[in-house]
């Protein structure tokens, strides 16, 4: 049996739950399409045991296999949206904090030099 990488053995519970939900949803999508595991696995280019592991939400199944399953159900185009920077509110907050920190208090002389003496009068 292959050794489990350390990263997979320490997944946060929320990630484990999310993967199980994704696997269950993909299994439901396959069943609603009245496809057998054998046929679906063949369409995906994987073995039936790998398909079963994916449908169980196994974190050891490659992202590419999950992506192929999403593509088969017409949801492949949603993958880039998962990490779209415009939805990364934590990074935006860090950017704002860094910008505020960098903002230096300017002396009147430096403001005059930057804006020109005429602008202040």
Regions found by a protein language model. Give the residues of each.
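N-terminal flexible/basic segments that precede or flank functional cores
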Residues: 1-18, 82, 86-121
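Short basic helix-loop element that most often maps to the first helix and adjoining turn
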Residues: 24-39, 102-105
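Short alpha-helical DNA-recognition segment
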Residues: 34-52
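Short acidic/histidine-centered micro-motifs embedded in hydrophobic/aromatic stretches
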Residues: 43, 69, 82-86
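Short, basic-rich loop-to-helix N-cap that marks the start of a DNA-contacting helix
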Residues: 58-71
